[in-house]
């Protein structure tokens, strides 16, 4: 049986996941999403994994959902489909998830990118929401997540036309944090993940929670949540280690305690 996602250790504390359906342009069928959820669940409970990098291949990150699978589903079947729960599991992953995008990230592939915390793009990266061409709309958060990221105007345009978004445009509008040479995309993403992996795990977790919560809470609620975590972290061993290392002029060794 084909290995739908290849998993490997890319650096100390960094798990690299590579989508592996090249003959289907890494189309995200249910089996692939289920596999991704299982790998993220394992990473969640593995203290050795501090950050995850998710990538595809040079030509294609993921070209959307698998239409051969979706075409068999009617409205009733779609109501019972497991996909929404799989997307929720991906969203619930508490450790940093970085996507390294080369080539096409279309439809569900674009939505998978929008589920990640940071995005590194190769110069050949291209994004789009082409569902309108099928008489549909994005069904895994494409309208909601993208609008919160780039605003209503651009999301309306891109979702209603299916226009392609270049890597340069993606960086300009905050879809990715950096555009790099295509052949170095994964390397840059792993370097970023390795840098994060050296930080205090507890602090990284609540930073992610605090920032993700901005679309779900008011400013006052967000500030309260931030302050609560600030006080909580003050009681951790990692905080003491960070302060001691600063005064002793050495690099801290964080243990997630």
Specify the residue positions occupied by each region the protein language model found:
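Terminal peptide-recognition signature
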Residues: 17, 21, 36, 54, ...
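Conserved CoA-thioester-binding segment of acyl-CoA-metabolizing enzymes
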Residues: 1-57, 88
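Phosphate-coordinating loops and pocket residues in cytosolic domains that bind phosphorylated ligands
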Residues: 27-30, 63, 72, 160, ...
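Crotonase-fold acyl-CoA enzyme core
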Residues: 89-202, 232-236, 241-244, 250, ...
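Charged catalytic carboxylate motif
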Residues: 31, 35, 82, 89, ...
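Glycine- (often His-adjacent) and acidic-residue-rich active-site loop
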Residues: 4, 56-89, 105, 135, ...
């Amino acid at each position: 049986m084909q290995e739908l996602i290849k998993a490997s250790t890319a650096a100390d504390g960094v798990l690299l996941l590579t989508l592996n359906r090249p003959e289907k342009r890494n189309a995200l069928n249910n089996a692939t999403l289920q596999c991704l959820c299982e790998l993220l669940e394992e990473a969640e409970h593995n203290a050795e994994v501090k950050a995850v990098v998710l990538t595809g291949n040079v030509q294609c990150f993921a070209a959307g959902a698998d239409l051969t699978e979706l075409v068999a589903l009617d409205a009733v079947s779609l109501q019972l489909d497991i996909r929404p729960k799989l997307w929720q599991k991906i969203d619930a992953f508490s450790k940093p998830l970085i996507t390294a995008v080369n080539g096409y990230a279309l439809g569900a592939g674009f939505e998978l990118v929008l589920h990640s915390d940071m995005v590194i793009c190769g110069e050949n990266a291209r994004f789009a929401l082409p569902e309108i061409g099928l008489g549909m709309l994005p069904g895994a958060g494409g309208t909601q997540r993208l609008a919160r990221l780039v605003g209503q105007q651009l999301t309306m345009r891109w979702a209603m036309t299916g226009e392609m978004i270049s890597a340069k445009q993606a960086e300009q509008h905050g879809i990715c944090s950096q555009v790099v040479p295509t052949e170095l995309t994964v390397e840059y993403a792993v370097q970023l993940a390795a840098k994060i992996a050296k930080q205090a795990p507890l602090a990284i977790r609540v930073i992610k929670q605090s920032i993700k919560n901005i679309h779900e809470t008011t400013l006052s609620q967000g500030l309260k949540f931030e302050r609560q975590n600030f006080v909580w972290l003050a009681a951790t061993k990692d905080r003491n280690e960070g302060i001691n290392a600063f005064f002793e002029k050495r690099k801290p060794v964080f243990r997630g305690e």
